[in-house]
């Protein structure tokens, strides 16, 4: 059921994180953009960027100052690897082989699937420390199926 439905490209609609008191933040900032892809051969990739990432002074690959390079890394969230789906419990497991966060390489990230509609996917995770104050927050990413036209 979910395995087939997930396949394809989904565009980020929102990325929020709520703490135990219910305070919600836009984790990557209002207007964050990105996509997640689930391929037919069992691979997935996600890329998310903040809307206000600092641009490099020049357009070379290594053209940024140290401050610009740090800002670019902090303004992006990305990983890829194989995925498996637990149909019964509506969970997708991301088995990471690549990640902007080095400590996540080799890990498995569990995401709870909610099918809001045929074209809207919600992925949420167990609470982790993220955002201001280092509070534990539960992330909720809302994705819309990419337009193929």
List each language-model region with its residue ranges.
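Lipid interaction determinants
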Residues: 1-149
């Amino acid at each position: 059921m979910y395995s087939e439905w997930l396949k394809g490209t989904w565009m980020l609609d929102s990325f929020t994180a709520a703490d135990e008191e219910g305070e919600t933040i836009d984790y990557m900032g209002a207007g964050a953009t990105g996509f997640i892809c689930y391929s037919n051969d069992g691979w997935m990739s996600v890329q998310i960027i903040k809307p206000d990432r600092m641009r490099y002074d020049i357009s070379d690959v290594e053209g940024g100052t140290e401050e610009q390079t740090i800002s670019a890394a902090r303004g992006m969230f990305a990983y890829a690897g194989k995925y498996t789906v637990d149909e019964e419990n509506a969970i997708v497991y991301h088995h990471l082989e690549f990640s902007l966060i080095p400590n996540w390489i080799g890990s498995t990230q569990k995401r709870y699937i909610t099918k809001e509609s045929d074209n809207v996917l919600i992925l949420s995770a167990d609470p982790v420390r993220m955002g201001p104050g280092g509070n534990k927050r539960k992330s909720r990413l809302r994705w819309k199926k990419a337009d193929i036209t």
